[in-house]
Each structure stands twice: as structure tokens, then as C-alpha cells.
């Protein structure tokens, strides 16, 4: 499956969080036979409107350049339970899967 990785930090105290997430998700994708075709990285926490890479990802959904988006946790993709249904609907309409490879506590 062709996948994109979406990486976002949870707070300003990042350290190597972005690099770690990218390595972790790329490794998982490769181990499961997925081809990583794009990586979207939002380097600052913030509201969805400020997540420019997420907005770029959403704009590419209908282009079908990837079949799934791998994220560390649903709380990386959406800022709250209220935001998630709208995002999930966009992914579903485009036929793109949201893939969360690890059992996470997706506290928003």
C-alpha cells in the first residue's frame, strides 16, 4: 500500500520527537510492506488551521497519491474528539485509510 506519514508534535517541548516519530513510522511501514510516498511534518503544536502540513495532506486526498496515512496516534491527527469526525469523513470520502500502527492511549 502507498502511504503517507503524518507527524505532529504534541507540545513545544519537542527534543527529537519529530525525528523519532518519522523513524518509528517509516520503520513500521517498511516492515509491513508499505511504500512511503510522502511525509507531512507539522513542527509546532497548534489548532488545526495552523497545521499547514495537515492542510496540505488534506488537499492531496483526492489526488490518490497515497492509499493510507500512518499516524502515531489519532491525537496527532486531530486536536480533539470534535475535530476528528470531520477529518475522518474527508479520508473516507477519498478512500484513504487512517492507520494507527501502535496501541496508543489517544487522549485528546
Positions of predicted regions on the chain:
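Short, structured surface patches at the beginning of a domain
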Residues: 1-108
Amino acid at each position: 500500500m502507498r502511504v503517507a506519514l503524518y507527524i505532529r508534535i504534541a507540545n513545544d517541548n519537542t527534543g527529537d520527537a519529530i525525528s523519532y516519530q518519522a523513524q518509528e513510522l517509516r520503520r513500521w511501514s517498511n516492515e509491513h510492506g508499505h511504500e512511503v510516498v510522502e511525509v507531512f511534518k507539522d513542527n509546532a503544536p497548534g489548532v488545526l488551521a495552523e497545521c499547514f502540513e495537515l492542510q496540505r495532506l488534506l488537499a492531496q486526498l483526492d489526488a490518490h497519491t497515497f492509499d493510507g496515512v500512518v499516524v502515531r496516534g489519532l491525537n496527532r491527527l486531530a486536536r480533539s474528539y470534535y475535530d476528528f469526525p470531520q477529518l475522518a469523513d474527508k479520508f473516507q470520502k477519498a478512500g484513504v485509510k487512517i492507520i494507527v500502527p501502535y496501541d496508543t492511549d489517544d487522549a485528546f
